[in-house]
Amino acid sequence: MVRPLSLGELPPSYTPPARSSAPHILAGSLQAPLWLRAYFQGLLFSLGCRIQKHCGKVLFLGLVAFGALALGLRVAVIETDLEQLWVEVGSRVSQELHYTKEKLGEEAAYTSQMLIQTAHQEGGNVLTPEALDLHLQAALTASKVQVSLYGKSWDLNKICYKSGVPLIENGMIERMIEKLFPCVILTPLDCFWEGAKLQGGSAYLPGRPDIQWTNLDPQQLLEELGPFASLEGFRELLDKAQVGQAYVGRPCLDPDDPHCPPSAPNRHSRQAPNVAQELSGGCHGFSHKFMHWQEELLLGGTARDLQGQLLRAEALQSTFLLMSPRQLYEHFRGDYQTHDIGWSEEQASMVLQAWQRRFVQLAQEALPANASQQIHAFSSTTLDDILRAFSEVSTTRVVGGYLLMLAYACVTMLRWDCAQSQGAVGLAGVLLVALAVASGLGLCALLGITFNAATTQVLPFLALGIGVDDIFLLAHAFTKAPPDTPLPERMGECLRSTGTSVALTSVNNMVAFFMAALVPIPALRAFSLQAAIVVGCNFAAVMLVFPAILSLDLRRRHRQRLDVLCCFSSPCSAQVIQMLPQELGDRAVPVGIAHLTATVQAFTHCEASSQHVVTILPPQAHLLSPASDPLGSELYSPGGSTRDLLSQEEGTGPQAACRPLLCAHWTLAHFARYQFAPLLLQTRAKALVLLFFGALLGLSLYGATLVQDGLALTDVVPRGTKEHAFLSAQLRYFSLYEVALVTQGGFDYAHSQRALFDLHQRFSSLKAVLPPPATQAPRTWLHYYRSWLQGIQAAFDQDWASGRITCHSYRNGSEDGALAYKLLIQTGNAQEPLDFSQLTTRKLVDKEGLIPPELFYMGLTVWVSSDPLGLAASQANFYPPPPEWLHDKYDTTGENLRIPAAQPLEFAQFPFLLHGLQKTADFVEAIEGARAACTEAGQAGVHAYPSGSPFLFWEQYLGLRRCFLLAVCILLVCTFLVCALLLLSPWTAGLIVLVLAMMTVELFGIMGFLGIKLSAIPVVILVASIGIGVEFTVHVALGFLTSHGSRNLRAASALEQTFAPVTDGAVSTLLGLLMLAGSNFDFIIRYFFVVLTVLTLLGLLHGLLLLPVLLSILGPPPQVVQVYKESPQTLNSAAPQRGGLRWDRPPTLPQSFARVTTSMTVALHPPPLPGAYVHPASEEPT
């Protein structure tokens, strides 16, 4: 056994290095980058020293500033309007939407409430009288809903949408029609008499029972009222609408119902109807001509035989249409029912919302639990409620997440030595990050950036995880500062060593989120901007306020106070003799591979007069062979970490009696230095790492081909809820969307009729457009208008031929003949407006099916005023609206003959139904076809665009991938520039960007394997992943650049320095994300928790496995090298007086160094801080 050497036996020519020895630039290195680095680090050093000097003031002012910004949350606005959240900013869709609102206003024509009925058993048939009876029960319960608001009772008949209520000159008949006119309800029950039960209107006539649709025969009623009133015009209106006997002429589902009318086809036979046969082809409302509900709107999951006959269906759907808030407000404005409540549009909206919520509730409870069928109810208010609940801040999850992070930070930073522990720093750091997040969001509110679901559900946790990373980094670096650093410079030294890393990560994160704002979806643009601002506030808090907290904690540690409970002194504070390097004298240690360990044997005893433990450090030392060094002497260069106090435990027997416990020095840094780095940097391990990541990249490239576009509404709604069940059933059975083809102004409609017909034909031929029945004309205003003109032309021709209409009189003709007479004599010339010679020389519609241009706008005025049902069915929504014009056949004055022309149209629309849209590819195909049709029409001079929810929410997918690639490329370039500027090494910046690009590709591929579809939300996360990935890579890269020696040595040193803070940062991010897993929304779990968790794990693997291996193989040369001042004797060979260790300098390692390590066992504690009390050594024997 080799006898330990005394200090006097050290090699004679060793000169200890000065602490402030300046770094020397390597040969061939650029001096400008190093000067810039030195200048930047000098600024950080100065900042840290100033903050430490005025830590109390900085902390107070910082908390006040951040607290003031956090008050901005009081003015935060949460946006839940889908159009405001998802329509692309500045896109053609937003411009088209603006044009529509400019012409028609904010509100749609009506709102929809839907009931879907399916069998409990999968695939069960609903085309049975029993199933229809259950549907009637649910629909009837829903239609009888009443709510009381503002002292009034509101039922369906008051708030429902009524299509084309005609104006009748007879006051009594007009009031009766107003009360009786049916609501628009699209239901399969309209094929039967029971559909009348859903209509709640009633009227009273003397001598008759209450008139309701269940007992109303319009033909019989007109015959009874004929002798008492002139109803010829009203009769013609009903005949044109093909009302017939209305509901009383339809079969009864239950022919045994005592109220089933005698006119029902199966009333006398008492036979149940053939439900499949009756529903085949759809149903009609009270008007057979204008109210045809196509089969696809009523039945889902249908099956047919070989002849095309309907056999069965799996779902039924009924749709109740309500007025919009504006329509309801206008309808009751000035009415006697609302004159005393200050009627407003907001009140109208509240009435509709209350009725819709009650509608959904009662409909879902209508059927008994043991029924064979189930009802799914939904309304537009339900969707708003979902979005509102989706956007609410979950206080429980926020508080739980932050408490979990507080606990983790406190436990992670606790140490055995109370004076060295940093639990309070961890608590204060997390609370500071929470305040920074609140202040960032408050600043966003003050800047007018609206909040949305992503802001409230995701950002608090994501920002917490990212912000705490830098807290761990600074705290870790602060405890590992060189022990001989003067006390006033501790904070400056900490910022000088870690400020660059913090700046790099924060700037890259901000740039990443700002680049993510390139995605033109308002909700995600707001989220990206808010995230960037929050990261900026975190950066300011970490760089300015947190150093003040560390400085205060330094004072506590210097005074040997307890952690957390800083008012109490530490019971385990030690008094230690501080052994300075100068005590070694001017002796020099030759440079070689040998590991020089100066082991100071420490003995402790407790003084009788004090409770303090006194440590005596006798001057002894010995040399040991470094057999336990995993990487050889190369790992322990002066450029490496100086955190190996307590790492040497030489000696046996009584000298080892005070050896510390293993758990006292086993840390992540210890693991990285002694286990992880030696294993990772072996040649075979490097090959395995490169092979693994190459295979992962290859699999990810394949997975990227599996990623589909899309985001279904079912992904947003919580699973297991009734709303999710409805949306799933609707997507499966009734994937129908109402759209419109809008024609704008800027062209002459009268001379472009052929182009309009061609446009309609091209649009109708699209695969996704549901064609009308073969027996029904297209449902557009231009077709209805032309058909109406042809009808009155035929009536005129008949009256002219019979002599009831002559050149000078039309009083004996029919109502339609008289209208045609007035139109035919119009010239359109203001000087000579009438020309009676045209009665026989012109037609209202020519042989080509076109309306004469000079008659077009005057005929439009007459049609709008005379055919309200046709106008309502066409959904034309003319702007400017044609003027009102009343026709009186018996008024033959010249003024009555003149017809005012409508103003040139600036807005009109053709309605269509799209069906079969299940996947995003189906939507994209339909959108592209519609856009192509509009482009072709534009070449013919017709300005048109498609409108509807598919174009609002799915058109983003046309350019989403291009936008994604553009944002990623721009961000990678920006990341390269930022890293190259702050690291002053384009070589290193290139390696970082390579790793980040690999992470993005791999995350995209893993999304494909997980079945996560690509929408604007994953695009934001993918773009932001580049910035977040910098957290895991730049620390290792910076540690590699600032280390000395070979690539392996510098990679090991970088891992030792950064393994702990990077791991702590990843764990803190995962803890922040963990609270997202408790969300009620699968959307949050799948698209945020899963994706961000995968991103964090990928970042950890790439930062601690791939990047060190790449740096050890392809890393840039060191920028600086620390050179010790040595005497010439150091370079000569020498041998110790005792023992077999050689001090030869190996020729292959010209820059090898000896390392002097102070190891001592002081009640499990490292040496004290600079300036600690030093007790004089006693003469206690060894």
Curated annotation (Swiss-Prot):
Any ranges marked Cytoplasmic in the topology annotation, and which?
1-57, 415-428, 479-501, 553-686, 985-991, 1035-1064, 1108-1182
Tissue occurrence: Expressed in epithelial cells of the developing hair, tooth and whisker.
- Its name, as the record gives it, is Protein patched homolog 2
Give the SUPFAM superfamilies listed for this entry: Multidrug efflux transporter AcrB transmembrane domain
> What start-end ranges are recorded for coiled-coil regions in this protein?
none
Matching PANTHER family, A to Z?
Answer: PROTEIN PATCHED, PROTEIN PATCHED HOMOLOG 2
- Say which species the protein is native to: Mus musculus
Q: Which residues are glycosylated?
A: 370, 812
What gene makes this protein?
Ptch2
The chain positions of domain SSD read: 394-552
InterPro entries given for it?
HMGCR/SNAP/NPC1-like_SSD, SSD, TM_rcpt_patched
